[in-house]
Amino acid sequence: MLIGHSLHHMRPTAVDSSLPTSATSQTISNTKSRLDPHRVRELTFIGVGSSVAYLLNELNGRFADSGVTTPFLGKVSIVGKDDSWAENVRGKGYINHQTEIISQWDQQVPKYDPNYAARAEFSASNRRQLTRTVELGAEHLKAQVTGISRLDDGCFRINLDNGQILQSRQIVLGTGAGPHTSIWNSVTSHTQAEKRLDNIKLHEQKALRGKVLDLDEFMRASDASPQTFAGKTVVIHGPNAGIDAAERAGELGANAVWFTRSTNPVLLDGNQLKFAPELAKSAIHKVDKLDIRPTKLENGFALRLHYSSLGQDSREPKKVLDADYYVYAMGQDIHKPGSAAAILGSLLDHLEPIYDYDQVYSDQPFKTVIGLQSRGSNSDNGLIIVGAAVAQLATNVQHSYKDHALDRILEEMTRLPEKQTEKLSQMLLEGAPSVQIQTYLKTWQLDSGQPPDKQVLQNQVENYLAARDYFQRQTNEQKGNLDGVAAEVKNQTLTEVASVIVSPQLGTIKASAAALSGLMPAYVANGENNFTTDNRTMLRAGIAARYPNIGNAEASAFIDEVVTLRHLNSQRFIEKVAGEMMDKGAQPLVSLRPPVLGVPASVRTAYEAYLHALNSGAHDGTPLSQRWLPKK
């Protein structure tokens, strides 16, 4: 899907009626005329975080050399206040991924650096994309969206918290997964996420302020006054998001106690954490029901926690723990004001998945969902949901691949003799076995002028049957309890490095943005590839540009090996390299840098040397993994 396709159509852009009007959008794009506030935008982005910034990167690159100074003037709007990675939201520090994995696409591939990416630099790179879009004529409205509705003409009405109303043909919604689920809500009706935390009770809430903090509040407070937490008892509640809090507590010299309900923290492969791994072994308490009260003791503790374990008999006394601070990180709330579910309202019931139709992830598009959209969306019009919100909403969105595939088949049938297509149509609609349908197709006898149409239809039918069989297997394996399209959203991780294990991580948000927009990084044209994150299309384009003599089969084999290698976790990677060596003791395997940390410069050079030799006709059968071995 080419986001903002209508921007190429050069529709006239409305200006204030009291001002002279221009004939085309291009003319208006080069004027300073005051725009009509009631105009219909071609494209509106909601959100200013990473998912939107990745897409702005593609849009900026597409129009930067268009010959028009401000191609987005009057046509593109961006609505949003803060990037959730900004210092004023999540504090300082780092992101638990390398720059190679999460950085914006630029003129060159990022240099290899196994250390974690700086949060400030990542946020600044998002900001640079936003700034560039504004320089190209887009307006940035620092407001919060309160609701979206669809109009009779197919456009969308967007309500802002400042009272402003926008209309737009296309919307990209990238507001993230929502704020941390609150445990403070004792007045208004609870959201679904808040109801899941009704096992936690806060008593005398006014006295708890400043002592009971969500993860972001804790990060900001410890940035501002790290000495405040030194030597204090900090209770961290939450398995995975809590990892950041546990690591920070260790850095501050605090006494950390870690609460989880049933699952243990999942530490990412290749992590460089100093304190969280040990705390995950020694400081875990399995907690079900929890009551938190303020207390004043001689030793200065400010909180008293009464808790029970999962499955504990209600007649047993609760355990007691005194602490200075309680930090919670137990998921995000997609239904809070300003978040995707709250914004969408009734549109939630009209969403469908966006499949990997360009086959970026595999040759079976139905296995991977890269976003969500309002039904009937296309490159010119509609609502597209991207980023972390996709995984949050995916469980309530149903598959539509088979329906669309069948529609395409029925349309293709109109080009062929009715006497043959009628039976095929009946077999498909009645759910005939795949073997029976394929056998029938082979019996067709068509006129000499019709084979191309038959081949198209045959391909479509085979694709439909493969999808039908896949979804049936999924249904059987899950005993009918399919979780919407969640499994296919998670399949985005299957081509990423081993530290990317769930779809809301930045690695998959970046990858899905590229797949959705068809982005081709500038560094590919400059003779480089990022072997850590480039998708199959990017890798194939790079090979074609640099090594034109390499055939499709050889290129595909190389790409498959690159993707398979980078997806291995550290242990499996080392085992693979060792298993391929004739003399396992000949190389110092302990010094191997696994792909989860990125691709070192020496390995990049070795990959390019392999491709150069292949381009020259030399066939080296040595596995690519052997090129990761340190030189003697």
UniProtKB/Swiss-Prot annotation:
Membrane-spanning intervals of the chain: none
The name this protein goes by in its record: Effector protein hopAD1
Extract the coiled-coil ranges from the record: none
Q: Region Disordered: what ranges?
A: 13-34
Origin organism is Pseudomonas syringae pv. tomato (strain ATCC BAA-871 / DC3000)
**Where is there biased composition of kind Polar residues?**
15-32
Tell me where in or outside the cell this protein is found.
Secreted
This protein's GO cellular component annotations are:
extracellular region
UniProt KW keywords: Secreted
Provide the taxonomic classification: Bacteria, Pseudomonadati, Pseudomonadota, Gammaproteobacteria, Pseudomonadales
The reply to whether Secreted figures as a keyword in the UniProt entry is: yes
Q: What is its main location?
A: secreted
Answer yes or no on keyword Disulfide bond: no
Matching entries from SUPFAM superfamilies are given as: FAD/NAD(P)-binding domain (SSF51905)
